[in-house]
């Protein structure tokens, strides 16, 4: 599974992308929830 020719391994790209998506979605929901709570 070490057949990358100087490129970034796909599993690292997938892991970083997945964590980025989780962080963005989490921040989005947290911002929406905090905005909803403060507007009430």
From Swiss-Prot:
Localization terms from the record: Cellular thylakoid membrane
Residues that span the membrane, as ranges: 12-26
Disruption phenotype: No change in growth rate or oxygen evolution under standard growth conditions (50 umol photons/m(2)/s and 45 degrees Celsius). Dimeric PSII less stable upon isolation, accumulates a PSII assembly intermediate (PSII-I) in which assembly factors Psb27, Psb28 and Psb34 associate with PSII; the complex is lacking PsbY, the CaMn(4)O(5) cluster, and O(2)-evolving complex subunits PsbO, PsbU and PsbV. Only the D1 protein translated from the psbA2 or psbA3 gene is found in PSII.
Keyword entries, A-Z: Acetylation, Membrane, Photosynthesis, Photosystem II, Reaction center, Thylakoid, Transmembrane, Transmembrane helix
GO cellular-component term (any): plasma membrane-derived thylakoid membrane
Matching Gene3D superfamilies: 6.10.250.2070
PTM-bearing positions, type N-acetylmethionine: 2
Subunit structure and binding partners: PSII is composed of 1 copy each of membrane proteins PsbA, PsbB, PsbC, PsbD, PsbE, PsbF, PsbH, PsbI, PsbJ, PsbK, PsbL, PsbM, PsbT, PsbX, PsbY, PsbZ, Psb30/Ycf12, peripheral proteins PsbO, CyanoQ (PsbQ), PsbU, PsbV and a large number of cofactors. It forms dimeric complexes.
Protein name per the record: Photosystem II reaction center protein J
Gene name in the database record: psbJ
């Amino acid at each position: 599974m070490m057949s990358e020719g100087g490129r970034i391994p796909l599993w690292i790209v997938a892991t970083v992308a997945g964590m980025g998506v989780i962080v963005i979605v989490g921040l989005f929901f947290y911002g929406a929830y905090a905005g909803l709570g403060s507007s009430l």
